[in-house]
Amino acid sequence: MAHKKAGGSSRNGRDSHGKRLGIKAFGGEHVIPGNIIARQRGTTWHPGLNVGMGTDHTLFAKVEGHVAFRVKTGGRTFVSVLPMTEAAAE
């Protein structure tokens, strides 16, 4: 008994579109409340000061200021927004 699948039945041919993940506002960039800083799957970057996290782990600014990245002990990267008064001082 031959066990050969009938021709013309392709199992390939599926491919999903890119999800446009990554950093949207880089370090030092000016942001306003609600601006998306990073889109991610899981917590590649963690929310720091003045940064909120959505249900899909999207990081967004809570105040107007400049974006700052900081790596803490343990290797976790935290994203913060330094308010305009603090950002001007640095």
Curated annotation (Swiss-Prot):
<dbReference type="GO" id="GO:0006412">
    <property type="term" value="P:translation"/>
</dbReference>
<protein>
    <recommendedName>
        <fullName>Large ribosomal subunit protein bL27</fullName>
    </recommendedName>
</protein>
<feature type="region of interest" description="Disordered">
    <location>
        <begin position="1"/>
        <end position="21"/>
    </location>
</feature>
<comment type="similarity">
    <text>Belongs to the bacterial ribosomal protein bL27 family.</text>
</comment>
<dbReference type="InterPro" id="IPR018261">
    <property type="entry name" value="Ribosomal_bL27_CS"/>
</dbReference>
<keyword id="KW-0687">Ribonucleoprotein</keyword>
<dbReference type="Pfam" id="PF01016">
    <property type="entry name" value="Ribosomal_L27"/>
</dbReference>
<keyword id="KW-0689">Ribosomal protein</keyword>
<dbReference type="GO" id="GO:0003735">
    <property type="term" value="F:structural constituent of ribosome"/>
</dbReference>
<dbReference type="GO" id="GO:0022625">
    <property type="term" value="C:cytosolic large ribosomal subunit"/>
</dbReference>
<dbReference type="InterPro" id="IPR001684">
    <property type="entry name" value="Ribosomal_bL27"/>
</dbReference>
